[in-house]
């Protein structure tokens, strides 16, 4: 059985070199099924297969499809490791200020990561997850979206929020769980959410966001809204059953959604060689009928072009798209992880020194004459000052009142929750000296 794959390099933003396998149509309208059309075209079963579940030819030779003889999906890139544009027709020709925003967002995220990681090591916050090495996937994709597009993140997409101008003070407040935290201290650190910036609150269990994002995209389609949903996840989450359910629902219901997979090499401590045997995550898309592409995740322009084109077509065609961004997780999985137990220092240093997305974009800026060493020093100093000011403010704030543990779930608090709230109040009144209640809002 062979699947029809069309590799269509086009020009400019529309190249995005998408692997096509699916149906096109008008947004918001149902389309006829190709299998039904074929049944009308072929009156004899001897002419063509007419099974409704697949499109294929009959063969008279017994042969199993071998996964290792199918050529791998290529990796789309725009600039090389030296920051040089490879094919001028693929240059997105972004204005200087926008590219500088890319760079400032990526480096500001990197600075915030370093400070919050160290603060966890000092016992100031309970947990943290860095984004080292994956900054290009965040910023490149976020820049290609409209501000009203709905984002479902996993737990390593802080750069998407940062590009949407989420305040540093709220990043810090969430990690500290203080009174300014929109979640009122009830979420783990790095589990951000912001309704005003259309960023759905992050949930810890892997892949739960995938079918939820498909439901949101289906709702957008039903409303005929000019928006899409983007759903981020890692290659490890793609092994969860929710990923299969989400992909299949999106394809069969024809939802305007971008599945954005950050393939960073590891699912916590499990390398990709032990996660799957096929050709990565992008290769799964055609099996579901999803248009797919693999991009260099360390090339912010490749990520931007692919996401921009996928968004345009998702809106126009009411179709799902899958982007697999190949990158590398330079940091530990989290502050609860020690990656030296399962990978070498040389491996990490290679990606940090030889193919870092920030270094590549900086080199591009230097090549263009848009950045120099003096600006670099000044910005590094300024960005650290901004992060430290927000950090110190968040640390001084009180924690939310413990009674808020029970609020914001039901419109009217049920009797059982009221009893639990009253029980906690009595407990703290009796044994309050054993708790740091002076750190909490009264």
UniProtKB/Swiss-Prot annotation:
K(+) binds at residues 203, 205, 208-209. It catalyses: N(6)-[(R)-lipoyl]-L-lysyl-[protein] + 3-methyl-2-oxobutanoate + H(+) = N(6)-[(R)-S(8)-2-methylpropanoyldihydrolipoyl]-L-lysyl-[protein] + CO2. Thiamine diphosphate binds at residues 155-156, 204, 236-237, 262, 333. Its main location: mitochondrion. GO terms for molecular function: 3-methyl-2-oxobutanoate dehydrogenase (2-methylpropanoyl-transferring) activity; metal ion binding. Keywords: Acetylation, Magnesium, Metal-binding, Mitochondrion, Oxidoreductase, Phosphoprotein, Potassium, Thiamine pyrophosphate, Transit peptide. It is an enzyme of class 1 (oxidoreductase). Mg(2+) binds at residues 235, 264, 266. SUPFAM superfamilies: Thiamin diphosphate-binding fold (THDP-binding). It is found in: Mitochondrion matrix. The modification Phosphothreonine is found at residue 335. It comes from the Eukaryota. Phosphorylated at Ser-334 by BCKDK and dephosphorylated by protein phosphatase PPM1K. Its EC number is 1.2.4.4. Pfam families: E1_dh. The modification N6-succinyllysine is found at residues 353, 377. Heterotetramer of 2 alpha/BCKDHA and 2 beta chains/BCKDHB that forms the branched-chain alpha-keto acid decarboxylase (E1) component of the BCKD complex. The branched-chain alpha-ketoacid dehydrogenase is a large complex composed of three major building blocks E1, E2 and E3. It is organized around E2, a 24-meric cubic core composed of DBT, to which are associated 6 to 12 copies of E1, and approximately 6 copies of the dehydrogenase E3, a DLD dimer. Interacts with PPM1K. This is 2-oxoisovalerate dehydrogenase subunit alpha, mitochondrial.
